């Protein structure tokens, strides 16, 4: 049994398979998941698990080069936006419209659906390298 890091076998497998610039999405429970993109559904009830809890665990186990967020999060969920900025200090940040964000999710290796039920609590994580 693993002692640390991501214990969820599906998430661990996706993280292990990422190459430089590949993307994964951590999403609230309302983000549409495009056909053909791997869905890892963690939602058990509204709010559980939280977006920020899942983000923290994934970020601790992933080299992240860039982060993409919907620009709407700035005005509609400033608290989550601030927490993302505090948790992810190193990567570059990019803000796009929510419609563009949804288009970008079509290229993700996986979308991790949380129980989060606050507006625009979604992030695209772009894989970096560890060297």
Curated annotation (Swiss-Prot):
It is an enzyme of class 5 (isomerase). It is found in: Cytoplasm. One of its GO terms (cellular component) is cytosol. Homodecamer. This is D-ribose pyranase. Its EC number is 5.4.99.62. It catalyses: beta-D-ribopyranose = beta-D-ribofuranose. GO terms for biological process: D-ribose catabolic process. Gene3D superfamilies: RbsD-like domain. One of its GO terms (molecular function) is intramolecular lyase activity. InterPro entries: D-ribose_pyranase (IPR023064), RbsD-like_sf (IPR023750), RbsD_FucU (IPR007721). Keywords: Carbohydrate metabolism, Cytoplasm, Isomerase. Substrate binds at residues 28, 98, 120-122. Catalyzes the interconversion of beta-pyran and beta-furan forms of D-ribose. Pfam families: RbsD_FucU. Belongs to the RbsD / FucU family. RbsD subfamily. Pathway: Carbohydrate metabolism; D-ribose degradation; D-ribose 5-phosphate from beta-D-ribopyranose: step 1/2. The active site is at 20 (proton donor). Its main location: cytoplasm.
